[in-house]
């Protein structure tokens, strides 16, 4: 068997090769460091994977309870007045398609509560000392389309969107003691099915501070932060079923959205 060459020259060459390899491996950046270096180079654009969106919005809401009653009956007006109160909503989107815009499936939930004085039975226009509270918790499943093609290509910050979906809203009425009220031999709570359609627009805030937006993406994976405005028609009246509490409204909401 031929013996491998050895000697001072060979050993020196091997030592030099090993030292060079160690230096190169030690100097090589990790994937995250490489990404950060690339993203901070002049003119570079970093974009982490984008699969989800979360938005939180607020807006005025007045459930259309009185639409199911014939005149002159208007129990919501008698109990809670004709004003609108705050509706808080949150939605989580799973983005399934990115080409000429973004298509997503969204799951949302909201919360609304209003309190008022019960009217005197003999004179509905006169409030009594008894308090009643209506609580509504709407849940929605939506198909969402956002036209963000020019945002991704050119950084244009205005992104319109459209939404269509189904709703189910839980409702309950409690008395002044916080207990579920009773009416017509039953308990004053239930659920109503419905549907909604909405259009809106988002102002993506990345342009205000591109460096901070890029760092937010690199470090936290948040691709975009945006102000969102939306106007929607909510028909939550039972999808044709009778004897359901009507909880729909035409209203607007505004809030923040994060894509990641």
What annotation goes with each model-predicted range?
Residues 200-260:
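Predominantly the C-terminal beta-signal and adjacent terminal strand-loop region
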Residues 58-64, 109-115, 147, 166-174, ...:
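Transmembrane beta-strands of outer-membrane beta-barrel pores
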Residues 42, 56-58, 88-96, 107, ...:
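Residues on the lipid-exposed face of transmembrane beta-strands in outer-membrane beta-barrel proteins
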Residues 89-176:
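Gram-negative (and chloroplast) outer-membrane scaffold detector with strong preference
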Residues 63-84, 112-139, 170-193, 240-246:
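Extracellular/periplasm-exposed beta-strand and loop segments of Gram-negative cell-envelope proteins
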Residues 43-50, 95-103, 148-158, 206-225:
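Short loop/turn motifs that connect adjacent beta-strands in outer-membrane beta-barrel proteins
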Residues 1-48:
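Cleavable N-terminal export/targeting peptides
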Residues 32-95, 238-246, 257:
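Short glycine/proline- and aromatic-enriched beta-strand/turn motifs that initiate or cap beta-hairpins
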């Amino acid at each position: 068997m031929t013996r491998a060459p050895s000697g001072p020259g060979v050993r020196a060459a091997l030592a030099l090769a090993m030292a060079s390899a160690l230096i190169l491996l030690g100097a090589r950046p990790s994937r995250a460091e490489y990404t950060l270096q690339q993203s901070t180079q002049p003119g570079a654009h970093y974009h982490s994977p984008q699969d989800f969106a979360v938005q939180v919005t607020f807006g005025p809401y007045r459930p259309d309870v009185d639409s199911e009653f014939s005149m002159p009956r208007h129990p919501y007006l008698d109990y809670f007045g004709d004003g609108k109160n705050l509706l808080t909503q949150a939605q989580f989107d799973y983005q399934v398609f990115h080409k000429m815009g973004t298509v997503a499936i969204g799951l949302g939930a909201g919360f609304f509560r209003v309190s008022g004085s019960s009217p005197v039975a003999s004179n509905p226009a006169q409030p009594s000392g008894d308090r009643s509270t209506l609580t509504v918790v709407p849940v929605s499943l939506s198909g969402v389309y956002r036209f963000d093609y020019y945002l991704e290509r050119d950084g244009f910050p205005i992104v319109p969107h459209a939404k269509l979906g189904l709703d189910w809203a839980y409702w309950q009425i409690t008395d002044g003691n916080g207990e579920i009220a009773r009416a017509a031999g039953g308990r004053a709570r239930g659920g109503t099915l419905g549907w909604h359609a909405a259009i809106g627009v988002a102002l993506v805030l990345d342009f205000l501070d591109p460096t901070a937006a890029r760092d937010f993406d690199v470090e936290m994976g948040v691709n975009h932060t945006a102000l969102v405005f939306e106007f929607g028609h909510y028909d939550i009246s039972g999808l044709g079923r009778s004897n359901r509490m009507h909880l729909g409204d035409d209203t607007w909401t505004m809030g923040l959205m994060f894509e990641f």
